[in-house]
């Protein structure tokens, strides 16, 4: 029914549409953002329908088709969160967050990709709560997990999430044994639209995910850093102060 997912057509159609609307709205950026949010919500309705239909008719659709649909859905989420991230302070609800619940939600969201790629998903939490915004923290961790899945090794892939307390901080580490990041690229991974050199031939990327979550972490008062050795591992480290609050 759906045929192949025409990613290039969707991408260029969206860019053309954004350019047209940007010219139309001119400097009224709030109207433009509102248009983008409405457009995205309308697009997500048929995508959700496609995902559901694929799940209910797995014999008709191969795994790669469903994977591409989920990837498209994630990219659209990325656009939505990028639009919202410019003035997220109005949307923050800082509370004590249960990390177990957050990670459970993320693992369920990515369950199909984890299973289809034979990725071992480990969670060992020494500390189970942090102060943050639940919705935005889920987005941040989900983006990191998506990167781990995209840049995995072909065999014996592992994603491991651990947490520990260190003086006045809670440290959450997300480790994978994927293709890693070249040393020369590590300083630029949070730059807008930057993609690592050893990942370009493996999978297409907007280069916006880490840029967005870095900005979000700054506003939430969290610290984020990355350690990596090419062809060995990548570790993303999130640090939460016990009294973290977001920054205006």
Language-model features and meaning:
Residues 88-92, 125, 129-132:
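Conserved micro-motifs of the catalytic ATP-binding
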Residues 148-152:
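Short helix-loop "hinge" at the ATP-lid/N-box region of the Bergerat-fold HATPase_c
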Residues 158-168:
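Short beta-strand/loop element within the Bergerat-fold HATPase_c
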Residues 181-193:
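Short conserved segment of the HATPase_c
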């Amino acid at each position: 029914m759906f045929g192949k997912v025409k990613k290039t057509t969707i991408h260029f159609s969206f860019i053309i549409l954004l350019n047209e609307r940007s010219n139309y709205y001119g400097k009224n950026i709030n109207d433009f953002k509102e248009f983008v949010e409405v457009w995205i919500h309308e697009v997500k309705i048929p995508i959700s329908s496609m995902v559901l239909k694929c799940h209910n008719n797995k014999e008709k659709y191969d795994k790669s088709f469903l994977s591409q649909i989920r990837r498209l859905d994630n990219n659209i989420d990325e656009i939505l969160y990028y639009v919202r991230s410019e003035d997220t302070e109005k949307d923050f609800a800082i509370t004590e967050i249960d990390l177990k619940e957050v990670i459970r939600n993320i693992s369920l969201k990515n369950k199909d990709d984890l299973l289809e790629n034979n990725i071992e998903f480990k969670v060992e939490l020494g500390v189970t709560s942090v102060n943050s915004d639940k919705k935005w923290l889920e987005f941040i961790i989900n983006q990191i997990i998506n990167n781990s899945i995209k840049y995995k090794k072909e065999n014996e892939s592992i994603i491991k999430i651990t947490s520990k307390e260190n003086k006045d901080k809670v440290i959450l580490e997300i480790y994978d044994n994927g293709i890693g990041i070249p040393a020369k690229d590590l300083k630029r991974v949070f730059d807008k639209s930057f993609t690592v050199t050893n990942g370009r031939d493996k999978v297409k990327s907007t280069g916006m995910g880490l840029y967005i979550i870095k900005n979000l972490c700054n506003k939430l008062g969290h610290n984020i850093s990355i350690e990596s050795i090419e062809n060995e591992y990548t570790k993303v480290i999130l640090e939460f102060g016990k009294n973290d609050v977001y920054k205006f």
